Amino acid sequence: MAAASYEARAYGVYSATPSRTAQYKCPHLIFVPPRFDVYKAVAAQIREIFDRYSDLVEPVALDEAYLDVTENKLNIVSAQAIAQAIRSEIFKATQLTASAGVLGNKFLAKMASGLNKPNGMSLILPHEGLDFVAQLPIEKFHGIGKVTAVKFHEMGIFTGADLRERSVSELVARFGKVGRFYYQIARGEDDRLVVANRVRKSVSVETSYDPDLNDRVRIESALDRVAIDLHRRLEQVGMSGQTLILKVKFADYSQVTRSVTQSMGFMGVRRIQDSSQQLLCALDLEGRSVRLLGLGIGKLMNEEQDFHQLRLEV
């Protein structure tokens, strides 16, 4: 068995259960052959949704990933709101439910994501992290398998609270280098960063408006603010680029994109603003209401590359 539905799990059937055993436990079990092509296609859809919200997406499996939304593409302040929006988009695009854990580090987020499966979201505030970890059975800790759990039990460690009572030296002596990690997670600490395993191809920001913008002056003013947001984001990631992309979505959900490329790149906020306004000026907005404005930079290069390029051209 590669996987089992929640209905099958009620009969004691889980992934890795031998088929004969599974059928014995649940005689009316329905076996479905795998469709890896469909699985990969849906996973790609989900990944596209993740990428709309953050450049920092670290896939763990085809259907699972860590996202760092501290600086997200849509400038949404609430991580909980982002998680809910992503779950809604996934269901709308695939008719599949998704679970999410909203916390400040990878370990806690992974643990929380399993609390309300198959279709829920868990939010644990920073001051709640220690209590959450303390009550967890040690075998429920992400990264601790059956064999390691037995070793912990032999030491009299059955919960996160038990683990927290042990010193780092004791844990390192028993488990080696990973003992230090066990010491940290018992305290709800995990300093691992979310690492995207893809080369960044663009940096973008966008803003939605409610009510819609239907006055050209307001649209131009709003676009200038989006340009400021894009410049700020470029500074955060230490990048600039040679292609500027404008995205405009209208009230009827139709959208247009326009782009311009400059060999010198778009390094200053004024250059981004001027070029984006030129792109906007070429659009016919008469009688149309704007619901969303977006700007992006492609053909990226880091600041050091920019510096050397400019010096050579001089």
Task: Give the positions of each predicted feature.
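DNA-contacting surface of Y-family translesion DNA polymerases
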Residues: 140, 148-292, 300-314
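Residues that scaffold, gate, or flank divalent-cation-dependent active/transport sites
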Residues: 1-62, 66
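Short, hydrophobic beta-strand segments
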Residues: 65-71, 257-262
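Long, highly charged, low-complexity intrinsically disordered interaction regions
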Residues: 77-137
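Short acidic, glycine/serine/threonine-rich loops at helix termini
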Residues: 1-4, 108-116, 154, 194-197
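Generic non-transmembrane alpha-helical segments
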Residues: 45, 49-53, 85-94, 151, ...
